[in-house]
Amino acid sequence: MKNHLIELKQAIYDKAYFNDEEGLELDGFQMVDTIETNAKITVEGENIKSLNEVNFYRKQQRLALRNCGVINPENIDEYIAFDGYKALEKVLTSMSQDDVIKEITDSGLRGRGGAGFPTGKKWMFTKMAEGDQKYVVCNADEGDPGAFMDRSILEGDPHNIVEAMMIAGYAIGADKGYIYVRAEYPIAVRRFQKAIDQAREYGILGQNIWGTGFNFDLEIRLGAGAFVCGEETAL
């Protein structure tokens, strides 16, 4: 008999005991049969209906990770059902490049790296830079020990990254994007490639997207895993 903490549909069950482990493969937490038929759950303590009723969680809201663990990351229809690609549609049909950059600047959005450089300024500088061909480069490599913030989104919500890179491409005038991922993240690579393939199939990536005249496509580049490989000039 083991003590478990279970989270299911925004409800937390503490001191839950699996009294009958027959039919459950615990090695690697792989379920080979349903809990309903092979386990009995006993809940002790005060009944709390949802996480929203817990003071610690009440005012917390997931942003970057909002879909992780909620939708099937390999199903574009589920992403669309959760308002996926609506922001891209709004950008392409009703906003100018400057409008998008102003929105990002006003939001105060910053990079997730240690420098915390304002994203709006980076997009503005790139838009103003001279050049016939521009690119969006997403550095999804992380070399710090135990770091997995980029991998978490790539594995749990890859279409979110596709949409974000497309919005960035529209804002700066780029029609091509590259995402740099270390080869040691096979699940992230596989799921992101599947997201790219699905977006192409749905006409979200490619030429003249939704009849707006905007062209954009994505490509994955695998890295060797060294931290220095993610430095801007090396990348």
Locate predicted features.
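Feature of Fe-S/electron-transfer and energy-metabolism proteins
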Residues: 1-235
